From Swiss-Prot:
Residue range covered by the transit peptide: 1-24
Lineage: Eukaryota, Viridiplantae, Streptophyta, Embryophyta, Tracheophyta
One GO molecular-function entry: serine-type endopeptidase activity
Cellular compartments annotated: Mitochondrion matrix
Naturally occurring in which organism (per UniProt): Arabidopsis thaliana (Mouse-ear cress)
Gene that this sequence comes from: DEGP12
Active site: 110 (charge relay system), 144 (charge relay system), 222 (charge relay system)
Protein name (record): Putative protease Do-like 12, mitochondrial
Family: Belongs to the peptidase S1C family.
Biological processes per GO annotation: proteolysis
Predominant location category: mitochondrion
C-alpha cells in the first residue's frame, strides 16, 4: 500500500488549526500544521483501523529527520544554445535537499545547475518562511549531484546531518521525503525497492548505478532523501512513466564517492572510466570464434574512444578477462563491471587482463573521467561560440540538441527489428533495433545486399558488425539449419519478401 503524508501547513479546506485527512483506496494523506508536528513523529491513516494502529506504533520518518530536509529555490537566466548570444526568459524552479556532515546541503545538480552570476539559489527549512542564500560549492552533472553552502548560523541551528546507509535489498520499504510541486508542504511517500542496476542519468547521458523504487513522486521531490529506518539510502533524481509511479534514486556508493571527490579535488570529475564499449560473451559461437575456453569469462571490446587511457594499448576485439585481479563475467553484469570501474578515480591506474587472439596479456591503464561523447554543457552557462562571415560555430552539446530538437536525417538502414528466441541466437536478445553495418567485413548497402552477403558466405563463421560497434558471430551452417526450424516453428512460409 502506498501512502503520502504531507506536513507543514493546514489544508485550504480546514479553517481550524486541526489536522485534515484525505483517504482514498490506495493513498492516505495527512496534512498537519507545523505547530502540531514539532517534536512529534509523522503518522498515516488508513480506512482499516487495525492497520492504522499498527502504523502508529512504527511511524515511517522521525520528525527530527524531517527538520534536516529543506526546500531549494533557484532563479536563473538561461542562454539560447541555438543563438548563444541571446538570453531567454528568467526561470524559477525548485526541488529538495537535505543536510549532510560539514554543514552542507546535498541536492541534485539539475535543481541548481549552473555555477555563474546568473544563478541565484535559496533554501528554506521545514516549517519556516525564511529563505537563506545558498552557494553552489560543488556540482557534478555526470552523477546529478551538487553540494550547497549556507553561511548562516541561524539556518544551521538545531539541524542535524542525515546519515547514509547501504544499498537496500529488493522489496525494502522506503520513504521519499521532499517538497513536490503541488505546494510548500513537506511530504513523505511510501514505496518499495524494485531494482538495483546500472542506468542512464538522463541529464548527462552517463551510466552509473541506480536504485528503482515503486513510489508516487513529483518533480519537486528531486534532490530529496529516500529513507529507510534512520538512514538515507539515496537521492531521488528521476521519475519514469506517465503515472510518476517509478522513482530513480542515486545510491549511497555514488553519493559517497562524489562527496569524497569533492573534498579531495577542486575538479568536478570524480568517477573513473575506461571510455570504451563492450558486449557480453554468452553465445557459444562467438566464444569459439574468439578462442575462449569453456571456463573462461570476459567481455568483448567493441570500441575504444580516442580519449581513453586504453587507446593504443587495448584493441577492438580484445576480451577483458579481469580488472585488478577481479574476474569479469561473460554475462556482462554491468553492476559488477561498470560500477567497479566508476568507483575508482580519474588518473587511477588499474591492471587489465585481456585475451587477444587466444593469448592472455596484462596492461596497466590510467582511468579517465566519466564523460559522455557529446559534451554535457551546463544549461544555464554562457555557451562557447565563434561567429565568422555570418556563420555561427558552436560545439555539439547535449543542451544544444535539447534546444534544437536535433535529429539525424532519415537514411535507409538495415536493422534487426526482432530476435526470435533460439539456441543459435542465445546471448544476442538485446541486439534488437540495432543497425547492421557490415557482413563479414563488407559494408551493407540495403536489405537485398545483406541477403546476398549472407547467402554467399563461404566461411565457417558469419560475422555481423552492428551499430555501436557491437559484434555478432554465428556458425554459418548451424544458423542455416536453425533458420528452417524457426520458420516452421512460427509458421512463416518464406525467409524473404520484397516489395
Amino acid at each position: 500500500m502506498l501512502f503520502r503524508s504531507c506536513v507543514g501547513m493546514v489544508s485550504r479546506y480546514s479553517r481550524a488549526l486541526l489536522p485534515t485527512i484525505t483517504i482514498s483506496s490506495r493513498i492516505a494523506t495527512i496534512v498537519l500544521p507545523f505547530a502540531l508536528t514539532r517534536g512529534r513523529k509523522i503518522h498515516t491513516m488508513s480506512k482499516d483501523e487495525e492497520w492504522w494502529k499498527k502504523i502508529r506504533k512504527s511511524p515511517p520518518v522521525d520528525e527530527l529527520m524531517l527538520e534536516s530536509v529543506v526546500e531549494v529555490f533557484t532563479d536563473s537566466t538561461k542562454y539560447s544554445k541555438v543563438k548563444p548570444w541571446q538570453t531567454l526568459n528568467q526561470e524559477s524552479y525548485g526541488g529538495s535537499g537535505f543536510a549532510i556532515a560539514g554543514k552542507k546541503i546535498l541536492t541534485n545538480a539539475h535543481v541548481v545547475e549552473g555555477m555563474n552570476d546568473h544563478i541565484f539559489v535559496h533554501v528554506k527549512r521545514h516549517g519556516s518562511q525564511v529563505k537563506y542564500k545558498a552557494k553552489v560549492q560543488k556540482i557534478a552533472h555526470e552523477c546529478d549531484l551538487a553540494i550547497l553552502e549556507i553561511d548562516s548560523d541561524e539556518f544551521w541551528k538545531g539541524m542535524n546531518p542525515l546519515e547514509f546507509g547501504d544499498i537496500p535489498p529488493l522489496n525494502e520499504i522506503v520513504y521519499v521525503v521532499g517538497y513536490p510541486k503541488a505546494g510548500e508542504t513537506i511530504c513523505v511517500t511510501k514505496g518499495v525497492v524494485t531494482g538495483v542496476k546500472t542506468g542512464n542519468y538522463l541529464r548527462s547521458s552517463t551510466k552509473l548505478l541506480t536504485i528503482h523504487i515503486d513510489a508516487t513522486t513529483y518533480g519537486g521531490n528531486s534532490g530529496g532523501p529516500v529513507i529507510t529506518g534512520d538512514k538515507v539510502l539515496g537521492v531521488l533524481f528521476q521519475i519514469l512513466g506517465d503515472k510518476k509511479s517509478t522513482g530513480v534514486v542515486i545510491p549511497t556508493p555514488i553519493i559517497r564517492h562524489f562527496i569524497t571527490g569533492a573534498e579531495e579535488s577542486s575538479h568536478n570529475a570524480v568517477f573513473g572510466s575506461l571510455v570504451l564499449s563492450c558486449q557480453s560473451m554468452k553465445n557459444a559461437q562467438i566464444r569459439n570464434h574468439f578462442k575462449m575456453s569453456p571456463e573462461t569469462t570476459g567481455i568483448l571490446i567493441n570500441k575504444i574512444n580516442s580519449s581513453s587511457g586504453a587507446h593504443k594499448i587495448l584493441r577492438k576485439d580484445d576480451i577483458i578477462l579481469a580488472i585488478d585481479g577481479v574476474p569479469v563475467l561473460s554475462e556482462m553484469r554491468r553492476i559488477s563491471f561498470n560500477h567497479f570501474i566508476s568507483m575508482k578515480k580519474p588518473d587511477e591506474n588499474i591492471l587489465v587482463k585481456v585475451l587477444r587472439k587466444g593469448k592472455e596479456h596484462e596492461y596497466n591503464i590510467s582511468l579517465k573521467p566519466v564523460k559522455p561523447h557529446i559534451q554535457v554543457q551546463q544549461y544555464y552557462n554562457l555557451p562557447s561560440y565563434y561567429i565568422f562571415g555570418g556563420f555561427v560555430f558552436v560545439p555539439l552539446t547535449k543542451s544544444y540538441i535539447d534546444d534544437k530538437y536535433y535529429k539525424i536525417t532519415d537514411e535507409q538502414h538495415v536493422i534487426i527489428s526482432q530476435v526470435m528466441p533460439d539456441d543459435i541466437n542465445k546471448g544476442y536478445s538485446n541486439f534488437k533495433d540495432l543497425q547492421v553495418e557490415k557482413v563479414n567485413g563488407v559494408k551493407v548497402k540495403n536489405l537485398k545486399h545483406l541477403r546476398e552477403l549472407i547467402e554467399g558466405c563461404f566461411s565457417k563463421d558469419l560475422r555481423l558488425d552492428l551499430e555501436n560497434d557491437k559484434v555478432m558471430v554465428l556458425n554459418y551452417e548451424s544458423a542455416k539449419k536453425a533458420t528452417f526450424e524457426i520458420l516452421e516453428r512460427h509458421n512463416i512460409k518464406s525467409a524473404w519478401a520484397s516489395e
